């Protein structure tokens, strides 16, 4: 046999279920309460620091965490009754002092956006009750607000609607024309009844005239032109001409000759009026006689007329025609005054006419329509207009007009008139009418649902800063102020697709609040988290909300998402999608949802971020799977890696609580009401994954909730009916419980669970029992776990001799007691836990290409094991040998031939040699540390006798 030796350079590759001969160097059979670290080696997990004892609500609870900043971090719970409780794992009070483990008050009906009026019978938020399982409530923290979503609540609209149409019209004069009648036909839109009017188109005038008050002596005093305004708006001009003629009776005497006047009238029709016909009957007229201002009486007769039909069931407004004389000016005020006077003269119309600038405004309590036979003279705007150019500059404040644009509905929009010095939303009803000059602004369709029902939408938990009243601050349960739809209609600015549906998840992406509802993804307006309506119905902008559908042949219900560099990865139960854009701009015109892959996803869990990749849990079959999604691109499928393959038979099916620390490269997996937590450690150098290791932790109690905040792994653990919050410093913090000694520069973590400091003054010693004791502090709740005390400091009186002293403790009545006199130092009280490593069978191994090949045919007898440790204190080794008793030995990490007085039994580097003298296949090697001191395994060098059993390897 040949004497050989071989080194296993590290044991940081974690647990593997592969056969031992296939394991890579560095993998182990079991790894309990350890953390693989590519730099430090296989280290004992940190002990937990007691944060506080808490009293949660009863029944099923939803747990969540809130991170405000490095000094203010909280854990909260929501009960099925809607009750919320919050505890600070770290916060600063009103005096700036750091406190932890304290309960923070929660108020339900105060502050901006209060929930007042939406509380249940217990005084809690009505929106947050009525759920059963914790996955039915989802949380999202943005800055100092935490949003809570109840997946059982159906989103609805309120009955709040935009103001209904006011029955009104605005008539704007377009031109001022002579001899024109500015007529209006006002009718009931539900009636098709017509009225018939007659208008003269030609007149004749009798040649016989009579006159009075003037002489008839050839002086022609009665001749002249005169415009006659006859009844029913008939207007004509009479031109009376005169020729003096010799009176025949006086012709015999030339000296006494007399002359007489001979008048010849001519008529010119200027406006034919109404109801003038060639045959008078009933209300129609045929002739009109008029005496001029000079006494000439003429008679005109209608010789031609036309018949006019119009819809004017309410009023036929027929003001006098405008003047045709050049010396008479035509003004808009005159025309409008005539129109108003004509309308006011008609009884029982119910119409109020108001002159505004060059416009006439009409209002009626019930619907009416208005048009004009003279469309070139004026424009009429009622509830609709073809374009913005048709709108006047003066109007009633609050009048709404639909701009039709074309026959298509998707280019319609609505404008409201805003009078100068008035505010939109005030004085818009007829009772508080305002008129004047102003501008037209965009508005929603009248009588349109405009408000989301806040009682059916998410609520938020907002922290109120500490004050004299609430020294540690408090949390306010509020309903966000969801902005109303202020433009468009259901076509141009439709309701978000979550209306009438349930919201599964809230996310935050590209400065937008994202809601997942059914197979739809809906985002808010950019930079406005509580607005899900477009800013304008005239066009689409990049800041408008996005509403997209995930099309698939499978039933698609989106449950969660996680942001990656290329977009937002979305998860349904059996497919994954990505929200992304090919443009520099992200908006409704550029956003799209791409299919990524089809893997089952447990929607009761959460996806986790793993730096540049994402991870998710699959819970089909007898064991769960953990997948990593890598190389996530806009186009093409990502690379899916089953990272849990090495522990495929060990990974529990009931894993529902993943949480990650991206900075430390750790993902923790927990199962509710179990004390075991699985962990996956990863580390990459460039494009290469240098470390990916599985390990498991055993907690002192059953796990209720866990999270990672700023390099601290926090757990809520239960024992019986008692609960603790505890923190594990994944990376050493300024307040991490450590041990050091004046004789050494090294500082080591203390490895106890639920640690708390017991001050020297709180410790008493009994000379009779020779035991020290203290009152059992809060949080000592774990049954079946071993209590211990450990002296980690020379404080308060610089007593260095006791540093490193350790004793097991027990509860006696209301006290904790332990052997010896410990009254000289402050000490640490906590629970011991075991660091355990089971190594695989040792084989002679050699490289075969990039793989390691184990020689399983040779004969190998292990003689000695040289364990090279990093920081290590009290350690145990156990060799299980087939057919023989186990060989267990305990070691202190001291060089006994060079040992300083009062030196800690902890070394920064130490080698422990364990004799074996056993065939490799009969040997199982275990390492264990149950002491508060550290344990860090770097490598193993074994020595043994090797024989290839005379076979030549081929």
Model-derived segments and spans:
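N-terminal beta-propeller domains
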Residues: 1-92, 388-557, 621-637, 879-884, ...
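Hydrophobic/aromatic beta-strand positions that recur at structurally equivalent sites within the blades
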Residues: 66, 87-92, 149, 158, ...
């Amino acid at each position: 046999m040949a004497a050989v030796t071989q080194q296993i350079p590290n044991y940081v590759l974690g647990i593997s279920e592969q056969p031992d001969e296939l394991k890579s160097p560095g993998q182990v059979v079991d790894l309990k309460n350890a953390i693989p670290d590519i730099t430090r080696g296989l280290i004992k997990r940190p002990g937990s620091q007691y944060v506080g004892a808490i009293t949660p609500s009863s029944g099923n609870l939803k747990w969540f965490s809130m991170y405000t900043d490095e000094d203010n971090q909280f854990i909260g719970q929501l009960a099925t009754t809607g009750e919320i409780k919050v505890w600070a794992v770290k916060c600063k009070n009103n005096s700036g002092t750091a406190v932890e483990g304290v309960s923070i008050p929660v108020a339900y009906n105060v502050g901006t956006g209060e929930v007042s009026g939406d509380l249940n019978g217990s005084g809690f938020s009505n929106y947050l009750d009525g759920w059963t399982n914790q996955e039915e409530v989802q949380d999202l923290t943005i800055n100092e607000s935490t949003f809570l979503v109840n997946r059982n609540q159906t989103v609805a609209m309120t009955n709040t609607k935009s103001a209904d149409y006011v029955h009104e019209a605005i008539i704007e004069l377009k031109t001022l024309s002579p001899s024109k009648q500015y007529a209006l036909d006002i009718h009931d839109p539900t009636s098709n009844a017509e009225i018939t009017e007659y208008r003269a188109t030609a007149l004749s005038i009798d040649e016989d005239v009579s006159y009075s008050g003037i002489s008839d002596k050839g002086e022609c005093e009665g001749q002249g032109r005169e415009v006659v305004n006859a009844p029913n708006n008939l207007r004509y001009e009479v031109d009376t001409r005169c020729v003096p003629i010799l009176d025949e009776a006086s012709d015999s005497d030339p000296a006494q000759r007399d002359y007489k006047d001979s008048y010849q009238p001519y008529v010119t029709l200027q406006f034919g009026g109404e109801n003038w016909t060639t045959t008078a009957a009933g209300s129609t007229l045929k002739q009109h006689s008029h005496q001029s201002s000079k006494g000439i009486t003429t008679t005109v007769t209608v010789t031609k007329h036309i018949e006019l039909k119009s819809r004017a069931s309410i009023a036929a407004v027929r003001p006098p025609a405008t003047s045709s004389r050049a010396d008479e000016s035509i003004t808009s005020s005159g025309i409008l005054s005539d129109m108003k006077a004509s309308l006011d003269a008609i009884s029982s119309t119910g119409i109020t006419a108001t002159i505004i600038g060059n416009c006439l405004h009409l209002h009626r309590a019930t619907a009416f329509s208005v048009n004009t036979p003279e469309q070139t003279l004026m424009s009429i705007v009622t509830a609709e207009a073809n374009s913005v150019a048709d709108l006047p500059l003066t109007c009633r404040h609050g009048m709404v007009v639909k701009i039709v644009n074309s026959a298509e509905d998707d280019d319609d929009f609505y404008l409201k008139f805003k009078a100068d010095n008035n505010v939109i939303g005030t004085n818009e009803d007829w009772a508080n009418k305002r008129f004047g000059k102003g501008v037209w602004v965009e508005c929603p369709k009248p009588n349109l649902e405009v408000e989301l029902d806040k009682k059916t939408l998410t609520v938020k938990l907002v922290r109120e800063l500490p004050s004299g009243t609430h020294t540690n601050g408090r949390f306010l349960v509020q309903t966000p102020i969801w902005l109303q739809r202020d433009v468009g209609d259901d076509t141009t600015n439709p309701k978000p697709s979550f209306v009438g549906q349930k919201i599964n998840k809230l996310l935050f992406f590209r400065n937008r609040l994202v809601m997942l509802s059914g197979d739809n993804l809906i985002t808010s307006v950019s930079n406005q988290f509580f607005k899900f309506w477009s800013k304008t119905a005239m066009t689409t902008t990049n800041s408008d909300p996005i509403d997209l559908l995930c099309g698939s042949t499978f039933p698609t219900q989106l449950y969660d998402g996680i942001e990656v560099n290329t977009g937002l990865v979305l998860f349904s139960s059996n497919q994954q999608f990505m929200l992304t854009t090919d443009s520099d701009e992200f908006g409704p015109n550029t956003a799209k949802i791409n299919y990524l892959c089809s893997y089952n996803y447990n929607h009761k869990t959460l996806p986790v971020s793993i730096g540049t990749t994402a991870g998710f849990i699959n819970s089909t079959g007898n064991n769960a799977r953990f997948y990593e999604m890598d190389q996530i691109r806009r186009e093409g499928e990502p690379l899916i890696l089953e990272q849990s393959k090495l522990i495929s038979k060990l990974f529990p099916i009931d894993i529902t609580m993943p949480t990650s620390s991206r900075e430390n490269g750790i993902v923790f997996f927990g199962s509710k009401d179990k004390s075991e937590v699985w962990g996956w450690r990863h580390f990459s150098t460039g494009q290469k994954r240098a470390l990916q290791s599985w390990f498991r932790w055993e907690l002192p109690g059953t796990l209720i909730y866990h999270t990672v905040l700023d390099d601290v792994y926090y757990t809520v653990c239960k024992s019986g009916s008692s609960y603790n919050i505890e923190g594990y410093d994944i990376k050493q913090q300024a307040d991490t419980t450590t041990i050091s000694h004046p004789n050494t520069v090294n500082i080591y973590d203390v490895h106890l669970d639920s640690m708390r400091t017991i001050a020297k003054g709180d410790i008493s010693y009994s000379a009779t029992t020779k035991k020290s004791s203290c009152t059992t502090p809060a949080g000592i709740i774990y049954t079946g776990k071993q209590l211990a005390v450990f002296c980690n400091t020379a404080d308060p009186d610089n007593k260095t001799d006791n540093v490193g002293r350790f004793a097991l403790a027990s509860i006696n009545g209301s006290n904790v007691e332990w052997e010896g006199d410990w009254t000289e130092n402050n000490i640490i009280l906590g629970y011991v836990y075991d660091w355990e490593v089971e190594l695989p069978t040792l084989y002679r191994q050699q490289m075969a290409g990039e793989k390691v090949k184990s020689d399983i045919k040779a004969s190998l007898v292990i003689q000695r094991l040289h364990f090279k440790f990093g920081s290590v204190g009290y350690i145990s080794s156990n060799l299980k040998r087939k057919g023989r008793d186990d060989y267990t030995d305990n070691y202190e990490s001291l060089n006994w031939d060079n040992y300083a007085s009062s030196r800690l039994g902890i070394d920064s580097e130490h080698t422990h040699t364990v004799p074996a003298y056993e065939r490799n296949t009969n040997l199982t090697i275990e390492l264990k540390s149950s002491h508060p001191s550290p344990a860090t395994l770097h490598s193993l060098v074994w020595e043994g006798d090797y024989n290839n059993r005379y076979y030549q390897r081929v």
